[in-house]
Amino acid sequence: KTFHLIGSPAYESSGNMVLGTAEGGKKITLYNVNDLNIKKINIEKLNEYYFETMHHEFAHILHQKRNFDPSFNRISEGKYVGADWYYYMTAQGAMPRTDDVAWSDGFVTAYAMSQSNEDFVENIAMYVTHTQAYWDNMMTAAGESGAAIINKKFTIVYNYMRDTWGID
């Protein structure tokens, strides 16, 4: 396995920053590592930009090796928004799609709304890098229908990690 560290950020054509990539079940690339400052540690920033990304990309490596239950793809089928995960249109124009907006639709992050593979790995990354209090708050804020969808997805994620990789 290879960790490839790139000093500067990468960007999509939409202008969104790319935090990391996973390739061929073997290589994880993390971008913007020159932004790390060991003299001024910011735990929230480390979690959001690096730890979540490492777990997210590692989860891609796992499913590139052994795919997850295809029933996961059907839970939010028709609700994935592709590159539009970053914003949504209202009568007032484009609005940023925040995580709390995504929660009520049954996604753990706005980025999870882009496609089912991202949805799957975001469940892993968010669960591993956040406290139980964060998860409980997310589920409460998601409302009854959003929480039910997240729970359904997470059950598949949990079973995949336990049954496929022996990780509980």
Each PLM stretch: what is its role?
Residues 3-168:
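Active-site-flanking segments in enzyme catalytic domains
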